[in-house]
C-alpha cells in the first residue's frame, strides 16, 4: 500500500499516486503552509486565517492567554476555573475549589430510610448496600447481631466501646476521679441507658463517705491510716488535689456547727454532696481542677 501513495513537497501530505501530479501542481500554485499550525492554507486567505485562528485571546474564567483556536478545548478540559458538578449536592462548583467543597459537603448527614440512622453523604452509597442486605436478612427471619454499644468519655470527648470503657477510664481519668466513679471492688460498668440510676447509686455512696459529722470525727484518722497503707502500691501516682485540699475536721466545735454539718449541698461542678462548712472551699478547688483539665484536653487536641 505504501507504493500507492506519494508525499507532496509543499503540504507534506500523502497523496494517492494516481492523483499526485494534479495535486502537486495545484498545491504549489494556490496553497501555502501556515507558519503557526503548519496547515495548508490558500495564499489569499492566509492573513485572515492568522487573525481568526492564531489571535491571542484570554480565557474569561481563568484569564489565561492563548491562541483563539485552542480556547474551546481549554475551556472544556484544561481550565481550573471551569464549572464541575459536585457528586454529593449536584451543584456546579469551580474545579479549583471542588476538593474543599466536597470534603465539607460529604461530611453532611442524611437520614437513611432503611435503618433510621444519620449517615454522612460520602458513605451513604456504601451504607445503603449494607442496609439493604440487612433488611433482606430481616425479611428472611435471619438473626442480625446488635451493634456494639458505646459510651461517651467526658475527658477525651470520644465514644468508647462499652466492654472497653472501664479500662479506658483507668488510663484517661485521673486516679482520684477514677476511684470516685469506680470504687475498688466494683468495676462493673452500668449501662449507658440508665444514667439516673447510676447517679443515684454514686450519690448514695458519696453521701455516706463525705458526711463528716462531729460525732464521726474519729473516722478521719482511720481513713488516713488506710490510705497510708495503700500508698506503697502506687508510688508514682499523684494525689487528687480535691482530697488534699479538704480542710481537717475540728477537734471541738459548738453545737451550731453540728447542725451545719447535717445540711448537705451538692457541688455545682462534680455533683458531690458535701456539708455546708466545707462546700465553698471544695467548689473553689473543684473549679480550678476543671479548668486545668480543660487546658490539658485542648493542648492534647
From Swiss-Prot:
GO molecular function annotation: molecular sequestering activity; zinc ion binding
Coiled-coil residue windows: none
InterPro entries: Innate_Immune_Apopt_Reg (IPR051986), TRAFD1-XIAF1_Znf (IPR049439), XAF1_C (IPR041386), XAF1_C_sf (IPR031220), Znf_RING/FYVE/PHD (IPR013083), Znf_TRAF (IPR001293)
Location relative to the cell: Cytoplasm; Nucleus; Mitochondrion
Record keyword Metal-binding present: yes
Start-end of Polar residues biased regions: 193-205
Zinc finger (TRAF-type): 22-99
Record keywords, A-Z: Apoptosis, Cytoplasm, Metal-binding, Mitochondrion, Nucleus, Tumor suppressor, Zinc, Zinc-finger
Main subcellular location: cytoplasm
Tissues and organs where the protein is expressed, per its UniProt entry: Widely expressed. Expression is frequently down-regulated in cancer cell lines. Isoform 5 is widely expressed. Expressed in placenta (at protein level).
Gene Ontology annotations for the cellular component aspect, listed alphabetically: cytoplasm; cytosol; mitochondrion; nucleoplasm
Region annotation (Disordered) ranges: 189-257
TM regions (residue ranges): none
Induction / repression: Up-regulated by IFNB1/IFN-beta in cell lines sensitive to the proapoptotic effects of IFNB1 but not in apoptosis-resistant cells. Up-regulated by TNF in trophoblast cells.
GO process annotations (BP): apoptotic process; negative regulation of type I interferon production; response to interferon-beta
Entries under PANTHER family matching the protein: TRAF-TYPE ZINC FINGER PROTEIN-RELATED (PTHR16295), XIAP-ASSOCIATED FACTOR 1 (PTHR16295:SF17)
Function in brief: Seems to function as a negative regulator of members of the IAP (inhibitor of apoptosis protein) family. Inhibits anti-caspase activity of BIRC4. Induces cleavage and inactivation of BIRC4 independent of caspase activation. Mediates TNF-alpha-induced apoptosis and is involved in apoptosis in trophoblast cells. May inhibit BIRC4 indirectly by activating the mitochondrial apoptosis pathway. After translocation to mitochondria, promotes translocation of BAX to mitochondria and cytochrome c release from mitochondria.
Subunit structure: Interacts with BIRC4; the interaction is not detected in. Interacts with BIRC1, BIRC2, BIRC3, BIRC7 and BIRC8. Part of an complex consisting of BIRC4, XAF1 and BIRC5; the complex formation requires IFN-beta stimulation. Interacts with RNF114, the interaction increases XAF1 stability and proapoptotic effects, and may regulate IFN signaling.
Protein name (Swiss-Prot/TrEMBL): XIAP-associated factor 1
Organism: Homo sapiens
Amino acid at each position: 500500500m505504501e507504493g500507492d501513495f506519494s508525499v507532496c513537497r509543499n503540504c507534506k501530505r500523502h497523496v494517492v499516486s494516481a492523483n499526485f501530479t494534479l495535486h502537486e501542481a495545484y498545491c504549489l500554485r494556490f496553497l501555502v503552509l501556515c507558519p503557526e499550525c503548519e496547515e495548508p492554507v490558500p495564499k489569499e486567505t492566509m492573513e485572515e486565517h492568522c487573525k481568526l485562528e492564531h489571535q491571542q485571546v484570554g480565557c474569561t474564567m481563568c484569564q489565561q492567554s492563548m491562541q483563539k483556536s485552542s480556547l474551546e478545548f481549554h475551556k472544556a478540559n484544561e481550565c481550573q476555573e471551569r464549572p464541575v458538578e459536585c457528586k454529593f449536592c449536584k451543584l456546579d462548583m469551580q474545579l479549583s475549589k471542588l476538593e474543599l467543597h466536597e470534603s465539607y459537603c460529604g461530611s453532611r448527614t442524611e437520614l437513611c430510610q432503611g435503618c433510621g440512622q444519620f449517615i454522612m453523604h460520602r458513605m451513604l452509597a456504601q451504607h445503603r448496600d449494607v442496609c439493604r442486605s440487612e433488611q433482606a436478612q430481616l425479611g428472611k427471619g435471619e438473626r442480625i447481631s446488635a451493634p456494639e454499644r458505646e459510651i461517651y468519655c467526658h475527658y477525651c470527648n470520644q465514644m468508647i466501646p462499652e466492654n472497653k470503657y472501664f479500662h479506658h477510664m483507668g488510663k484517661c481519668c485521673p486516679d482520684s476521679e477514677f476511684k470516685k466513679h469506680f470504687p475498688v471492688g466494683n468495676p462493673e460498668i452500668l449501662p449507658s441507658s440508665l444514667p439516673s440510676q447510676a447517679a443515684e447509686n454514686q450519690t448514695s455512696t458519696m453521701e455516706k463517705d463525705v458526711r463528716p459529722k462531729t460525732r464521726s470525727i474519729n473516722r478521719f484518722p482511720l481513713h488516713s491510716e488506710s490510705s497510708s497503707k495503700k500508698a506503697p502500691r502506687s508510688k508514682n501516682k499523684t494525689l487528687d488535689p480535691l482530697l488534699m485540699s479538704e480542710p481537717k475536721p475540728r477537734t471541738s466545735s459548738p453545737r451550731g456547727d453540728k447542725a451545719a454539718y447535717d445540711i448537705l449541698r451538692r457541688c455545682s461542678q462534680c455533683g458531690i454532696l458535701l456539708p455546708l462548712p466545707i462546700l465553698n472551699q471544695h467548689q473553689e478547688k473543684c473549679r480550678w481542677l476543671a479548668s486545668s483539665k480543660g487546658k490539658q484536653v485542648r493542648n492534647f487536641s
